[in-house]
Amino acid sequence: MVAAPLAVSGLTGCATSGYDHLVTNDRHDIRRVETYLNGLSSLQASFVQDGPAQQQGDGHFTYVPGRFEMVYEVPHAMRAVARDGRFVLRNADNGAVTHLSLKRNPLGLLLRHPVSFDRDVQVTNVSRGTESLQLSVAEADNPSQGLLTLQFSDVRGHLTLVGIQGVDARHHHFGLSLFDVQENQPVSESSFSLPE
């Protein structure tokens, strides 16, 4: 239920970094995603999370470039902060604190700022739907470490982040659906203090 280190099956062998190898429409949409993410000062939303073994949670998600916080209400009170290559979760019920490194975890790709999907990142897929856009990325030099998929609504050319999906090196799936999204609102710096 907690953001397990995200993983991937089926991404092995030599990887091509960046997205120059993709078709023009895909490159255009990737640049749109980069521009959107780099243009955010903040994003706040309610979330519903699916995790390993059908575990679920919900609460509030806050993102600013390079950091995010998740405050869980279900299944019980927990707070998680991702920043500086780390993910720290504190369970308010029992005081337990969990530390995960995001250095080689695809969730860490969301913490890069500015966001750029070239050089050491491999874009593995770009797909479009009715008023939606989805982009999947992995570490170019070691894609078997995991896959991160960002899901956007795409209404009249305006992107909004509405989902984050991932699979980790142990094949654990992580999914976060965002709703009631508010962008570029003031956020307290205390939101990103690491739980102790």
Task: Label the model's feature ranges.
Residues 8-11:
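Bacterial Sec-type N-terminal signal peptides, specifically the leucine/valine-rich hydrophobic h-region
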Residues 31-52, 90-147:
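Flexible, processing/modification-adjacent segments and terminal tails
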Residues 49, 72-76, 84-86, 93, ...:
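A mature extracytoplasmic/lumenal domain signature
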